C-alpha cells in the first residue's frame, strides 16, 4: 500500500501579571486570522481548473505547502477526499487542489491567484520554497498516491503570475513525494522522500546557477546513514543540514538525536540534543511543520503513530537545547503547512484534525515566535484602526509619511 501523501485579537503585549512568581513564563497566545475574503479577479483569462468562481477561502485540505514574505502567505496544492469539501463537480482535479492561493496580511483577505503557464499536477506532499519572487516546487504525487510522482522543478513568479518548468540536467532525484527541501548558498538541497513503496535516504543538490543536479555521496558507511523516511523537515545553519523527525507509514523517528549532514566533511553526523527540564524531548513525529528564524527552529503539530500532536517546540542550533513553548494549536493537526514571515510571525494552515473521521480543516492561525519589533506593532495597529489605507493611492500614502517598503505591503 502506498504511503499516505495528504494527510481580530490584540497583539501580544505587556499585561499586568496577577501575582505571578518571578521567572514565570507569559503564556504564548494563538490568534485566529481575520476572515475577510474577496472574490477572485474575473478579468484573468485562465482555465477554469485554475480558478473556481465562488471560492472565497481555500477549502479544507492536507498535504499542501505554504511560504511567506512580508506581504502574503502563499498556499499551494493539497488533498481532500471529501467530495463536497473539495468543490464537488467544480473541481476537475478532485480530490486534489490544482490551485495557488495567497493570504494578504494587510487586508486579511484570501485571493485565489490566476496564473499562466504549466502548473504542476503533483499536488500532494510536494516541496515548496520561496526564492526572491519565485516559488520553487519539487516532487509530490498525484492520485493514486505513489502512482504519479514528480521529480521536476517548477517555478512560479508571483509578481508576473506565471509558471514554468525548470530545464535541468544531471542526475535528478527519483520521482518522490514527502521529501524535505531547502536553498542553501545558492544550491537547492533535497533529502529523503518516498516513491509510495520505497523510502529514501538520498541527498541531492541542484545548482541554481547551472541547473545541474548531482547526488551527494557521503563518506559514511551505509550503516551510518540516516534511516529512510518521508514527511520530515530540515533546517540548516550554513554548515550543516539538520533532519527533524519524519518516518514511514508505520513509524515516526525520535527528535532526541538529530542527523546532520556536514558540508565540509561530506559526512552524516549524529548530534544529541538537550532535554527541556522534566518535559524532556518532543515526541517522535512525522507530518509536522517546521520554520526557522536565524539559529532557532520551531516544530509544531504532527503525528506520532497514535495521536495528533498540537505542541510547539523550539530547538537552538547553537546549543541543541529543546524548549517547549507554552502554546498549543487550537486544532492539533498533521499534514498541515506552516511558514514564517521575515518579521517572525508564523502562520499555520489546514491539515488533518481527526483520524477516525478523516477530517481536514481550512483554518488559518498565526503566532508571533519572537517579540515583534516596534515597527511591526505600530504597523498592525495602524492597519487595525485605519483599514482603508489599502484603498489609498501611492502618492497619498507617501504624503502620509509611509515608507515605500510599507506601501508595498499594502499592494
Curated annotation (Swiss-Prot):
Pfam family membership, one: Kelch_KLHDC2_KLHL20_DRC7
Record keywords: Kelch repeat, Repeat, Ubl conjugation pathway
Single GO BP term: protein ubiquitination
Top-rank lineage group of the source organism: Eukaryota
Transmembrane portions of the chain: none
Pathway where this protein functions: Protein modification; protein ubiquitination
Kelch repeats: 72-133, 135-186, 187-239, 240-288, 296-342, 345-388
Family to which the UniProt record says this protein belongs: Belongs to the KLHDC10 family.
Oligomeric and partner information: Component of a CRL2 E3 ubiquitin-protein ligase complex, also named ECS (Elongin BC-CUL2/5-SOCS-box protein) complex, composed of CUL2, Elongin BC (ELOB and ELOC), RBX1 and substrate-specific adapter KLHDC10.
Free-text function comment from the UniProt entry: Substrate-recognition component of a Cul2-RING (CRL2) E3 ubiquitin-protein ligase complex of the DesCEND (destruction via C-end degrons) pathway, which recognizes a C-degron located at the extreme C terminus of target proteins, leading to their ubiquitination and degradation. The C-degron recognized by the DesCEND pathway is usually a motif of less than ten residues and can be present in full-length proteins, truncated proteins or proteolytically cleaved forms.
Protein name: Kelch domain-containing protein 10
Lineage start: Eukaryota, Metazoa, Chordata, Craniata, Vertebrata
Amino acid at each position: 500500500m502506498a504511503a499516505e501523501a495528504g494527510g481580530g485579537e490584540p497583539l501580544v503585549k505587556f499585561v499586568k501579571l496577577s501575582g505571578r512568581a518571578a521567572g514565570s513564563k507569559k503564556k504564548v497566545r494563538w490568534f485566529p486570522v481575520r476572515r475577510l475574503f474577496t472574490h477572485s479577479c474575473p478579468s484573468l483569462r485562465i482555465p477554469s481548473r485554475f480558478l473556481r468562481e465562488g471560492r472565497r477561502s481555500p477549502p479544507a485540505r492536507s498535504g499542501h505547502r505554504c511560504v511567506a514574505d512580508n506581504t502574503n502567505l502563499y498556499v499551494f496544492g493539497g488533498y481532500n477526499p471529501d467530495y463536497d469539501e473539495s468543490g464537488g463537480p467544480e473541481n476537475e482535479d478532485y480530490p486534489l487542489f490544482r490551485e495557488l492561493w495567497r493570504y494578504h496580511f494587510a487586508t486579511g483577505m484570501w485571493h485565489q491567484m490566476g496564473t499562466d503557464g504549466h502548473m504542476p499536477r503533483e499536488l500532494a506532499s510536494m516541496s515548496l520554497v520561496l526564492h526572491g519572487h519565485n516559488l520553487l516546487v519539487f516532487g509530490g504525487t498525484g492520485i493514486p498516491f505513489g502512482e504519479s510522482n514528480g521529480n521536476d522543478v517548477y517555478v512560479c513568479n508571483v509578481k508576473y503570475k506565471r509558471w514554468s518548468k525548470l530545464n535541468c540536467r544531471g542526475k535528478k532525484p527519483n520521482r518522490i513525494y514527502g521529501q524535505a527541501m531547502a536553498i542553501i548558498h545558492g544550491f537547492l538541497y533535497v533529502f529523503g522522500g518516498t516513491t509510495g513503496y520505497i523510502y529514501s535516504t538520498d541527498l541531492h543538490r541542484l545548482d541554481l546557477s547551472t541547473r545541474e543536479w548531482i547526488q551527494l555521496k557521503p563518506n559514511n558507511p551505509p550503516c551510518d546513514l540516516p534511516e529512510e523516511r518521508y514527511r520530515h523537515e530540515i533546517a540548516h545553519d550554513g554548515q550543516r543540514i539538520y533532519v527533524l523527525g519524519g518516518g514511514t507509514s508505520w513509524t515516526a523517528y525520535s527528535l532526541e538525536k538529530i542527523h546532520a549532514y556536514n558540508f565540509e566533511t561530506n559526512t552524516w553526523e549524529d548530534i544529541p540534543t538537550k532535554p527541556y527540564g522534566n518535559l524532556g524531548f518532543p515526541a517522535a513525529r512525522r507530518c509536522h511543520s517546521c520554520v526557522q528564524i536565524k539559529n532557532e527552529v520551531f516544530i509544531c503539530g504532527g503525528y506520532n503513530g497514535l495521536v495528533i500532536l498540537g505542541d510547539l517546540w523550539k530547538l537552538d542550533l547553537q546549543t541543541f537545547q529543546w524548549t517547549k513553548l507554552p502554546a498549543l494549536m487550537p486544532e492539533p493537526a498533521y499534514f498541515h503547512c506552516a511558514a514564517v514571515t521575515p518579521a517572525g510571525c508564523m502562520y499555520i494552515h489546514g491539515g488533518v484534525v481527526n483520524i477516525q473521521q478523516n477530517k481536514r480543516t481550512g483554518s488559518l492561525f498565526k503566532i508571533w515566535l519572537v517579540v515583534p519589533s516596534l515597527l511591526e506593532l505600530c504597523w498592525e495597529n495602524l492597519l487595525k484602526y485605519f483599514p482603508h489605507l489599502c484603498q489609498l493611492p501611492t502618492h497619498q500614502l507617501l504624503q502620509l509619511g509611509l515608507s515605500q517598503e510599507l506601501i508595498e505591503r499594502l499592494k
